[in-house]
């Protein structure tokens, strides 16, 4: 747990997150309009999305299946009866004057996600509920001094709102929770998790309290769209509330926005209660009634999720806890790794992916899907290293060329005339020359200066342009130094 340092004492964070995850579907929740990102404004709008009189909603069954899959993935209980409600409020980008959501009878309740806390211990974050709702449109206020512009392309897109219990005790834990949830959604293929495209958005409820005291008044920070912003917003808001309370003030229950440039929260409006929205069942939509056979069928099709994959990597492949966590955290990286180890040593593959390949990717700011290196080519490289056909030094040079060109390691080695010297006789001759050229150093070595062994290795590597087999150098050099006539 991370405490907030006040002027007089320590305070605790109490945080709950509401995650709005866009359901991965080609069509919207109640209309057949496209959900493609980046289309021109108002080009993906049907009559229902614009709330034209007489238009009626027709439920997209696939979106319901995606929500069931997600609920199972977060260990939630599926409700066989769920009902859509109208959430009534006015906003310019909500043309109907209400949002179709699920308030009284959500599609799933309960559940949990496990994260690692600041001390590396497993912490279980409880889930309150998962419900389905439609997204609103988008308002733009910076294109004119006179008008605001409305884009309804997003209006009616299917969302899952996943609401946690207030079990999160620090901004770092909030970040870990979102990372784990996003990984689960991506493994399930129910949401792409792209926060930069608005496919995953977060509202954070935060209050502070003295240890073991009653809960304080919470504020809600709306529309956080990056993990970095979530952490910064929670840190600032926690400190702001502590400053108010320690100065004798009262925290107001309100909705806030976070200014990423200033690093501050500021009031948006007073926070509404459920009664303000006048929820009632939508008369145009029948209840969702689910058969157990459908739930069982979806459950049987679930993929291996991150936690199970981590356990398998540790228990079967014998990866370290850290390496297993990193490789399983991203679905695409995990798929790449598993393709590589079909034909290559798992431990060596993991080390080279996490150190050398990640280093190149991070430098260029690209993902594994944008990398030119295929899993088959990477596996070839690992096999060359395992068989000692090339040294680690040569392998790093080849890997960089693979990264830049996308070519296989064997083709690169042919084109660059890269070949490891593994002939013992050839290496022995080179070592003889090195020892003759450095007679005094050999004398010093034989008199106890063992550190000079590395010097001799370096001289051999220099003469061979780094292409000699290091293991053979060490073996032959030890023998030659013992036999050298002084």
Curated annotation (Swiss-Prot):
Pfam families: GatB_N, GatB_Yqey. GO terms for cellular component: glutamyl-tRNA(Gln) amidotransferase complex. InterPro entries: Asn/Gln-tRNA_amidoTrfase_suB/E (IPR017959), Asn/Gln-tRNA_Trfase_suB/E_cat (IPR006075), Asn/Gln_amidotransferase (IPR018027), Asn/Gln_tRNA_amidoTrase-B-like (IPR003789), GatB (IPR004413), GatB_C_1 (IPR042114), GatB_Yqey_C_2 (IPR023168), Gln-tRNA_amidoTrfase_suB_CS (IPR017958). PROSITE patterns: GATB. PANTHER family: GLUTAMYL-TRNA GLN AMIDOTRANSFERASE SUBUNIT B MITOCHONDRIAL AND PROKARYOTIC PET112-RELATED (PTHR11659), GLUTAMYL-TRNA(GLN) AMIDOTRANSFERASE SUBUNIT B, MITOCHONDRIAL (PTHR11659:SF0). Belongs to the GatB/GatE family. GatB subfamily. Allows the formation of correctly charged Asn-tRNA(Asn) or Gln-tRNA(Gln) through the transamidation of misacylated Asp-tRNA(Asn) or Glu-tRNA(Gln) in organisms which lack either or both of asparaginyl-tRNA or glutaminyl-tRNA synthetases. The reaction takes place in the presence of glutamine and ATP through an activated phospho-Asp-tRNA(Asn) or phospho-Glu-tRNA(Gln). This is Aspartyl/glutamyl-tRNA(Asn/Gln) amidotransferase subunit B.
């Amino acid at each position: 747990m991370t405490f907030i340092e006040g002027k007089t004492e320590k305070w605790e964070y109490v945080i709950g997150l509401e995650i709005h995850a866009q359901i991965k579907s080609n069509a919207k929740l109640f209309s057949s309009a496209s959900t493609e990102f980046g289309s021109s404004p108002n080009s993906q709008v049907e009559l229902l999305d614009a709330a034209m009189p007489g238009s009626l909603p027709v439920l997209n069954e696939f979106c319901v299946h995606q929500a069931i899959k997600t609920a199972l993935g977060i260990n939630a209980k599926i409700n066989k009866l769920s009902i859509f409600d109208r959430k009534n409020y006015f906003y310019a980008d909500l043309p109907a004057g209400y949002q179709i959501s699920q308030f009284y009878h959500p599609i799933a309740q309960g559940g949990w996600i496990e994260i690692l806390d600041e001390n590396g211990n497993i912490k279980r974050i409880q889930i309150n509920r998962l419900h389905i709702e439609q997204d609103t449109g988008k308002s733009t206020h910076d294109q004119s001094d006179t008008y605001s512009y409305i884009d309804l392309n997003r209006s009616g897109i299917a969302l899952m709102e996943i609401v946690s219990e207030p079990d999160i005790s620090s901004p770092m834990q909030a970040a870990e929770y979102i990372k784990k949830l996003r990984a689960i959604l991506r493994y399930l293929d129910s949401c792409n998790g792209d926060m930069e495209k608005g496919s995953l958005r977060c509202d954070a409820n935060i209050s502070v309290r003295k240890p073991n005291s009653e809960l304080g008044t919470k504020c809600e920070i709306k529309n956080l769209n990056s993990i970095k912003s979530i952490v910064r917003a929670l840190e600032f808001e926690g400190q702001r509330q502590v400053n108010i309370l320690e100065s004798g003030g009262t925290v107001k229950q309100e909705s806030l926005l976070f200014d990423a440039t200033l690093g501050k929260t500021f009031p948006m409006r007073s926070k509404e209660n459920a009664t303000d929205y006048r929820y009632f069942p939508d008369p145009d939509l029948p209840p969702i009634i689910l058969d157990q056979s459908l739930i069982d069928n979806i459950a049987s099709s679930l993929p291996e999720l991150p936690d199970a994959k981590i356990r398998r990597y540790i228990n079967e492949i014998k990866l370290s806890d850290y390496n297993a966590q990193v490789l399983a955290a991203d679905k695409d990286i995990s798929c790449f790794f598993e393709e590589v180890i079909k034909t290559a040593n798992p431990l060596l593959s993991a080390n080279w992916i996490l150190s050398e390949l990640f280093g190149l990717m991070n430098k260029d700011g690209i993902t594994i899907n944008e990398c030119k290196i295929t899993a088959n080519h990477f596996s070839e490289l690992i096999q060359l290293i395992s068989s000692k056909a090339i040294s680690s030094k040569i392998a790093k040079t080849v890997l960089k060329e693979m990264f830049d060109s996308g070519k296989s390691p064997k083709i690169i080695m042919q084109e660059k005339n890269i070949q490891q010297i593994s002939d013992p006789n050839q290496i022995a001759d080179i070592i003889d020359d090195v020892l003759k050229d450095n007679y005094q150093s050999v004398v010093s070595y034989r008199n106890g200066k063992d550190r000079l062994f590395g010097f001799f290795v370096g001289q051999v590597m220099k003469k061979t342009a780094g292409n000699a087999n290091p293991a053979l150098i060490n073996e032959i050099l030890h023998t030659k130094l013992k036999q050298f006539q002084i």
